[in-house]
Each structure stands twice: as C-alpha cells, then as structure tokens.
Amino acid sequence: AGHVAMIAGPDLVTSLVEPDEFLAYVSGDLGRRFVAGDADLAARLAAMDRRPDPDGRFRVTEFFCRDDTWQATVQRLVGESDAVLMDLRSFSAANQGCVYELGRLLDTIDLARVVLVIDGTTDRGFLEATLTRLWAQLAPDSPNRQAAAPAARFCEVSGPTAAESRALVGHLIAA
C-alpha cells in the first residue's frame, strides 16, 4: 500500500468534477490546479503527501496537465512509482493517445509492475502490436531488456462490480 498519483488532462477535469475542484472552478482558481512547468512539477512532487491518513488510507494526488506538461509529468511519476495502473479502455488506432506513456513504461519500469486495464472497447490486436513495436525500440537501459518479449499484466473489466474491483486490487498487489 502507498500513496497514489494520478495524471489527468483537461478532459477528465471537466468530466469528473470533485467538490474541491468545483469550488476551485467557482472561485476562478482551477487554473492553478494544472502543472505549470518543470519547477512547478518538482514543487508538487516534493509536497506530495506520502503518509497514510489516521484511518490508514492513502490520498490520491492529482496532477492535472496540459499539452506542454504531461510528458514530463509522466516521466517523473513513472520513475518514482512502485507500480503503475494504466487505463487503456477505448485504446485503438483511432484513439491511441497513450502510446507515449506505454513507451515510457517499457523504458522505465519493469513491466511486471504494470497493470493495464482493458475492456470490450480496447482494440487488443492494436494494443499488442503497439507493445511489440515499442518493445523493439526499448531504451538501452530499460529494466525490461532482460525479457525476451513483453509480458504485460492485463486486467479486463466490463463494469463497476465488486468482483472486478477485487481482481484489479489483486493485480496491483501482485505488481
């Protein structure tokens, strides 16, 4: 168990609004929630609360990013992570915005510590072809160089059920 960092773009900010984000929006302060550059990212990482709350739960730290900050944020968070959960629902040739992140994962963290969430909208053939292509371009210092081929840990979901939640947590614990 440990702290959770989540990267989100403007689309997620507008689709899933939490109470504190709504208050920031109403007060005109929502823009300050977005990572403003390298110095701001470093400050946010340094200030991240990594300790559990008194009830034992860990907080989720959200890193809202725009086009000019998300790649640096991905790189820094992946480099500091013990495990990574990546949502690849709807991933396809027409919706392949996560290719950069997949490449950074393969180059930076042991793939055994990564859980890829997929569902019926994920083009699994395209995903496997993408992983194979990225595998052929691994960085020389990638921790995955020792493996012969990518062995990704997939967690297929179909809806918000207790059984799927337990399975997802099980995958994360194993990672």
Regions found by a protein language model. Name each.
Residues 1-20, 25, 75, 126-127, ...:
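N-terminal targeting/trafficking signals and adjacent low-complexity tails
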Residues 124-175:
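C-terminal interaction surface of TIR/SEFIR-family domains
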Residues 1-57, 64:
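Extended, compositionally biased accessory segments flanking or bridging domains
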Residues 85-86, 112-118:
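Short hydrophobic alpha-helical runs that function as membrane-insertion/retention elements
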Residues 102-111, 136:
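Short, surface-exposed basic-aromatic patches at helix termini and helix-loop junctions that form
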Residues 90-104:
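Conserved TIR/SEFIR loop-to-helix hotspot centered on a Trp-containing motif
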Residues 80-81:
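An anion/phosphate-binding loop that grips the pyrophosphate of nucleotide cofactors and donors
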Residues 8-15, 90, 108, 117-126:
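Short beta-alpha junction loops
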